[in-house]
Amino acid sequence: MAREFYGYFDSIDADVREYDAAQFAHILKAAVQNGVSSHEGGLEVTADGLGLTTRVAYGGCVIEGHVYVLEDDGGGPLTLAHEPSGTADRIDRVVVRLENDQSARIMGVRLLTGTPSASPQPPALTRNAQVWEVSLAQVRVRASATAVAAGDVTDERGDPSACGYATPRWLDRAVAAQIRDSLTVTEAGYALDARQGKVLDGKIAQLSAEAARSAR
């Protein structure tokens, strides 16, 4: 049987309305997809080449209906320290993590340290009912390096599989409909093959990301 949920309304004496965090997250998750928002600097990760550090710009994101905001408290941007990588390159990941179990109930920027290797891979993202991570950037820590260069940072915010943008869920459908409407169908029953379908999916993701960036 279908179940309706709605909110939010003030209580009155004869009709008390109470809501908890899970109900608020339920509504927000239905409206907004996971990812960074256009708030402030969008949680962009950068490096200045002056040490084994990266910086995270002010901004915000939405993860599974929960909201995270990094703002200026007067002490400067958030700085992360990366460990030296020794004799082989390593790829770290800067993520925003939601910890939703009852003992934690917290969100924050976290540094995932990779494993040095001749062919290094970024740490896997944890995504389950209790912990959900979105990746802001990959950071390559080069062997024996004493600094992270600007070019060692790979922005992952625009990759929907890693992070994405906190745009309305209807936006992807609207973009897809726009693309379908713009296609000129010359044969009845025209169908996309696997390659064309993959290209179309990529274009939809690209346009969604561009729409989110233009809203900043």
Give the location of each predicted region.
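Short, solvent-exposed loop/edge segments of extracellular or virion-exposed proteins
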Residues: A177-E187
